[in-house]
């Protein structure tokens, strides 16, 4: 891996998207980074346009392109942040493996096959992948695990429901973050846990083994998750909400810094690793 001194040469994959623009904007403002590439799909209306201007900032001198940049200095620190779509991720991973670039994957809605491809890529390069780049969300996931562990055997039983709210443009439901909350909670509840997505009609009484998911798509909500832990006589509601998209962009940049500055070798890492909260 490259030496960890000097600015990180940053390429943003999905640079013309809502999240990619914020990564570009925050990356340009951060002296730890030097933007060297802004990639979008071949049919993007923004090809050839300055990535800084597209992001609403001063011109960066880096045009949005469908072709990956060729770095002049192979020893330069480099990292790729991917905020694209599932159909675009495979080419990004292939490129990073080819050039040996550390990769931060923030795209959600990946198939099982794509997740497996990420795991295989991580044998060659360091990869951070998480369903949410938000520091607050990842901390909340650890809190949700602790609440579940403490209350799973409470008299009368523990009911867990997950509500998530996102903007009308979000394509996948439930969100990857909601599913990760559920995965961690189920890990505490046991193997018999079932996952129920919404309810309609005469469903009968709720079973103690269920985790319920409810997805709301409205307006421009950048993301909100509420985990309800219900017991007989009382409840806990754990709520984490984004005020804007910058929390996701800054989290992705923090992950890229972590990969480079900690000189991480090949492996599949999570935001728990970035935050120093991993159980491994």
UniProtKB/Swiss-Prot annotation:
GO terms for molecular function: 4-hydroxy-tetrahydrodipicolinate reductase; NAD binding; NADP binding; oxidoreductase activity, acting on CH or CH2 groups, NAD or NADP as acceptor. Its EC number is 1.17.1.8. It is an enzyme of class 1 (oxidoreductase). The keyword NADP applies. It comes from the Bacteria. Coiled coil: none annotated. GO terms for cellular component: cytosol. One of its GO terms (biological process) is diaminopimelate biosynthetic process. Transmembrane segments: none annotated. (S)-2,3,4,5-tetrahydrodipicolinate binds at residues 167, 176-177. Pathway: Amino-acid biosynthesis; L-lysine biosynthesis via DAP pathway; (S)-tetrahydrodipicolinate from L-aspartate: step 4/4. NAD(+) binds at residues 14-19, 40, 106-108, 130-133. It holds the Pfam family DapB_N. It is found in: Cytoplasm. Its main location: cytoplasm. Keywords: Amino-acid biosynthesis, Cytoplasm, Diaminopimelate biosynthesis, Lysine biosynthesis, NAD, NADP, Oxidoreductase. The active site is at residues 166, 170. The keyword Nucleus does not apply. It catalyses: (S)-2,3,4,5-tetrahydrodipicolinate + NAD(+) + H2O = (2S,4S)-4-hydroxy-2,3,4,5-tetrahydrodipicolinate + NADH + H(+); (S)-2,3,4,5-tetrahydrodipicolinate + NADP(+) + H2O = (2S,4S)-4-hydroxy-2,3,4,5-tetrahydrodipicolinate + NADPH + H(+). Catalyzes the conversion of 4-hydroxy-tetrahydrodipicolinate (HTPA) to tetrahydrodipicolinate. Belongs to the DapB family. This is 4-hydroxy-tetrahydrodipicolinate reductase. It comes from Rhodopirellula baltica (strain DSM 10527 / NCIMB 13988 / SH1). The gene is dapB.
């Amino acid at each position: 891996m490259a030496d960890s001194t000097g600015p990180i040469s940053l390429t943003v994959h999905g640079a013309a998207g809502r999240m990619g623009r914020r990564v570009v904007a925050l990356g340009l403002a951060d002296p730890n980074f030097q933007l060297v590439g802004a990639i979008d799909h071949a049919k993007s209306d923004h090809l050839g346009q300055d990535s800084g201007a597209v992001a609403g900032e001063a011109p960066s001198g880096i045009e949005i392109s469908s072709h990956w940049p060729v770095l002049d200095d192979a020893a330069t620190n480099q990292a790729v942040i991917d905020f694209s779509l599932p159909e675009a991720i495979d080419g990004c991973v292939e490129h990073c493996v080819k050039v040996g670039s550390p990769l931060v994957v923030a795209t959600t809605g990946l198939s099982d096959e794509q997740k497996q491809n990420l795991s295989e890529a991580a044998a060659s390069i360091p990869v951070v992948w998480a369903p949410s780049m938000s520091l607050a969300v990842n901390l909340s996931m650890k809190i949700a695990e602790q609440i579940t562990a403490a209350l799973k055997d409470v008299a009368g039983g523990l009911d867990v429901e997950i509500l998530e709210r996102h903007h009308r443009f979000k394509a996948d439901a439930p969100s990857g973050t909601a599913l990760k909350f559920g995965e961690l909670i189920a890990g505490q509840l046991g193997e018999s846990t079932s996952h129920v997505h919404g309810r309609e009609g005469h469903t009968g009484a709720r079973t103690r083994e269920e985790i319920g998911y409810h997805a709301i798509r409205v307006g421009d909500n950048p993301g909100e998750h509420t985990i309800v832990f219900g017991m007989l006589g009382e409840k806990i509601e754990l709520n984490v909400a984004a005020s804007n998209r910058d929390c996701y962009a800054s989290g992705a940049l923090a992950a890229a810094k972590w990969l480079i500055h900690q000189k991480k070798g090949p492996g599949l890492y999570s935001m728990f690793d970035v935050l120093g909260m991993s159980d491994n």
